[in-house]
Regions:
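Short, well-ordered beta-strand core segments
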Residues: 79, 105, 123-125
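Short, glycine/polar-rich helix-capping loops at beta-to-alpha or helix-loop-helix junctions
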Residues: 107-120
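A charged, well-structured terminal subsegment
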Residues: 71, 132-155
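Short glycine/serine/threonine-rich phosphate/pyrophosphate-binding segments
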Residues: 1-4, 62-65, 87-94, 116
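Short beta->alpha connector loops at strand-helix junctions that form conserved
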Residues: 46, 83, 109, 124-132
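Glycine-rich, small/polar surface segments that engage phosphate groups of diverse ligands
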Residues: 1-72
Length: 155
């Protein structure tokens, strides 16, 4: 659910207007231009149910996210890997794939950081070990990330 939430906040405006480039706004016309926002291409890997079902039927499930990174990742992209322990094999494999492609990788984990702490370009470790508490602390972190991205890309 967190992945869906974050992707949604990036695809649409998060906290303030995101003006469309003038050339795009003109092509869209007034109605669309006034009701759409500057957008960022953000994908939630767990939401691709059709792919996931096919992959886990035919291949080793813990590599599904890494396969998606290979399919969709391109230079300049950032992979945000979220795992309370930092040791979720599916997330670790996805980060390794992202690193191999030259993507930036950010981990969002609990206190220890687990395996992600050593393989992500940046690992944000919240000060908790209890899973529900880690998840609660992740919310303000990813809202802050969304705000910083929006402020930077849509001044």
């Amino acid at each position: 659910a967190d992945c869906e939430h974050i992707a949604g906040e990036l695809v649409k405006r998060f906290s303030r207007p995101r003006n469309l480039p003038n050339d795009i706004a003109k092509k869209l016309g007034p109605d669309l231009a006034q009701n759409l926002h500057g957008a960022l291409p953000a994908l939630s890997l767990p939401s691709m149910v059709g792919f996931t079902t096919a992959f886990v039927n035919d291949d080793v499930p813990e590599y599904a996210f890494a396969q998606q990174v290979l399919a969709f990742g391109k230079p300049g992209d950032i992979l945000l890997g979220i795992t309370t322990s930092g040791n979720s094999r599916n997330i670790v494999h996805a980060v390794k794939a992202a690193n191999a492609l030259g993507l930036e990788s950010i981990g969002l984990t609990g206190q220890s950081g687990g395996d992600l702490a050593s393989i992500c370009k940046l690992c944000i470790q919240v000060p908790a070990t209890d899973v529900p508490r880690v998840q609660e602390l992740h919310l303000p972190v990813y809202h802050t990330l969304c705000q910083v991205v929006e402020d930077t890309l849509f001044p």
